């Protein structure tokens, strides 16, 4: 199994409708071959601003690498660059 977790710190000037659309895009990119679990949502803790979490589990590292190289992921990553900064945690278990 391979785990991929991302925390997106959304920029303060991003509108709520734009953020909602981005969350929908992030949710959709998890519907892919090799993804065994996929959760995306807005953190309940807003002390550091709006934070979106993405928590994905993949069958293995090969499945993750294929997903990451795919066009849907690249497209949503490019869009998220305009809305947020992020931290990534990836590990095998």
Residue ranges, per PLM feature:
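Short, flexible helix/strand-to-coil boundary loops that buttress conserved ligand/catalytic motifs
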Residues: 68, 77-80
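Short S/T/G/P-rich N-terminal loop/turn motif that feeds into the first structured element of a domain
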Residues: 1-52, 59-69, 85, 89-93
